Structure formats: structure tokens, C-alpha cells
Amino acid sequence: PNREDMLFPSLMSSLDFYGLPKMAYYYARRAYEDRVLCFREQTDGSLIIYGCSETTDDLDGELEVRLTTYEGKVLWNLRQDACLAADSAVPLAIVPSAVLSAVPSYCCYLAAVFSDERCSRLKNIFHLTAIGEWDHVALPQAALHVDIHMVSSCEFELIIDTDVFVQDVVIEALDCDVYYSDNA
């Protein structure tokens, strides 16, 4: 959560507390992507989903927001048309506080996905848990699926997919250089 009383560096978003784009976010995801989705908690307990764009043109598409348990059950869903306005950070949707307070914060997360007609996709996940609540989260046993593709005689691509949310997946690659990307 991005709250005034919890300014822990790993919790920072791409918006400051005035709802304006934040430059400090560039060293993370925004350094690689011109458009991102981010979340901003309000004092009434609701959550605003922002679309941030550094491009010179608007992007029309569809926004889907899902409140999902770690087992994969969708508890709440919102689907609507949205526009990522050029060179700005604009509110795209609001998740009401009544929706967020209806479930324990450690059992689910919010996923926001923006897609357009060119099949571009932006995705971001917001965990409702506070810093000290991760010990209450009970993640189900995941069914990991791994695909390995040879890129060249000395390069391969490893794709890991799962049926539910997972954390702490460990990949060991011995005696070789490893380049990691989680941009999918």
C-alpha cells in the first residue's frame, strides 16, 4: 500500500501524494516502458487506478480490474473503456472501499489490465496486505509449467507459467550467464 504513514521504499508507486507523476519511479519499471498502470489509495479506503503515459499520443482501449483470491477465484470485476492520455497521469477507474473492505486483505489482490486494439497489454498487481501481514497469506500449491526454447546453440529461453499467484520461485542456472526479464 502507498500510504502517508507507510513510506517504505519498496511501496512507492509512480504517483506522488498529489496524484502527479513521480520521477523516482524511473529506475524501476518506468525506465523500460512508456506507459504503466499504477494504484493510489485514498483516505476513504478506495483505490484509484491511474494510467501514466510518456508518449505524445492518446491510447484508447479497455481496462479490466479484478479482485482475485490467491487461489484464482474472482471476487469482483470491472470492465470499461479507458484512454491513456498523452504525457500525463490520469485516473482510469476507482475500486470502492466497500469492495476492498469486504474481504480480509491477506486473501486476495487486485489485478489491472489495459489492452487496446493492437493487442498491447499493460498489467499491474496491487497486494492489499500491509508490510506485517505477509505471514497471514496462505498461498495454494501452484502447478508450475515450464517451457524451454533454444534461441541459438548457446542460448535458451525459459518461460514459467502457473495456474495461481506464486511467490519465491527459484531458478538455478549453473556455469552460464543469465539475463532475466519479467516484462510478460
Segments the model singles out, each with a brief description of its role:
Residues 1-184:
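Carbohydrate-binding surfaces of carbohydrate-active enzymes
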